[in-house]
Amino acid sequence: MNKQFSLNVNGKDHTVEADPDMPLLYALRDDLGLNNPHFGCGLAQCGACTVHLDGQPVRSCVTPLSAVGNGKVVTLAGLGTPEKPHPLQTAYVEEEVPQCGYCINGWIMTAAAFLRDNKKPTEAQIKESLTGLKCRCGTHISILRAVKRAATMMG
């Protein structure tokens, strides 16, 4: 049975009517029309669907709407703006990371939460924080450089 959910996404309030077990990802993409996060695997194994829920990265493909509650959801679109991009977004461009771009959502959202809480991370800590994310284009070295650059920018 469908239920009404009040969602705060990227600072704006929305109402969605859906099954409580429906993944947050579907509400974001289908009901709210956001083009990120992406559907990758549907099993929380690739990270393309990562969003922040109350500041913590979650895989929205397996997060039911009923688990969101009054939480605040931030997607990649809410992390920065074209006028004032998040340091990770700037670093990704400067390091020329994007190829196909499909996985960027997961990498940036995961790294943003990590860097917020870890001001001067080691390379090993960065690698550990990004464990479980997938990039089919194989840009892992460039991604690591971008996260290190962003850490310096945010330092």
Question: What do the predicted segments below correspond to?
Answer:
Residues 1-155:
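Signature of N-terminal electron-transfer/Fe-S-associated modules in redox systems
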